[in-house]
UniProtKB/Swiss-Prot annotation:
Stated family: Belongs to the non-disulfide-bridged peptide (NDBP) superfamily. Short antimicrobial peptide (group 4) family.
Record GO cellular component, one term: extracellular region
Keyword hit for Secreted: yes
Name of the protein: Venom peptide 3
Tissue spec. comment: Expressed by the venom gland.
Compartment list: Secreted
Keyword annotations: Secreted
Keyword Secreted attached: yes
Length: 9
């Protein structure tokens, strides 16, 4: 991933 905003949902 590069989306470390939505990874930890």
């Amino acid at each position: 991933y590069d989306r470390y905003e939505v990874v930890y949902r």
